[in-house]
Structure formats: C-alpha cells, structure tokens
Amino acid sequence: MSKITIVQCPQCGTDVEWGEQSPHRPFCSKKCQMIDFGEWADEENAIAGAPDMSDSDGWSEDQY
C-alpha cells in the first residue's frame, strides 16, 4: 500500500493530494493555477539571479 502525499497549494494553502486525481497539482484548482501564472506573467515573481545586462548598464555590442 502506497503512502498518500499531501502538499499545500502554493497560492491559497489548501491541502492537495498529490496524484492523478489532482490534475492541477501542486495547485488545488485551475483558479489558483491561473492566479499563479498571472503573477509570473506580470513579473511579480522571479527566480533569483544576477540581473540581466542591458544597454542601460553600459554594455554595447561596439565594445566587443
């Protein structure tokens, strides 16, 4: 018998059973999944890292 894994929805905190019966995992619903997607699309969320170098940072193709 396999152990049931329960995770919390990253958007609202609701418990979600991790398995085929939860098609939006790790989210509890399509709504929470789309809210999260919107936050990424609006750049409210980001993966930490070095900032991109742009022309405003003094970089140009003429330097190389």
Curated annotation (Swiss-Prot):
| Chain intervals for the UniProt region annotation (Disordered) | 45-64
Q: Which GO terms describe its biological process?
A: regulation of DNA-templated transcription
The record ties this protein, via InterPro entries, to: DNA_gyrase_inhibitor_YacG (IPR005584), Znf_NHR/GATA (IPR013088)
What Pfam families does the entry give? YacG (PF03884)
- Drop me one GO molecular function for this one: DNA topoisomerase type II (double strand cut, ATP-hydrolyzing) inhibitor activity
Stated role: Inhibits all the catalytic activities of DNA gyrase by preventing its interaction with DNA. Acts by binding directly to the C-terminal domain of GyrB, which probably disrupts DNA binding by the gyrase.
User: What's the superkingdom here?
Assistant: Bacteria
Query: What is the recorded name of this protein?
Result: DNA gyrase inhibitor YacG
Name the residues that bind Zn(2+).
9, 12, 28, 32
HAMAP family in alphabetical order:
DNA_gyrase_inhibitor_YacG
Q: Which UniProt keywords apply?
A: Metal-binding, Zinc
Keyword Cytoplasm, does the record have it? no
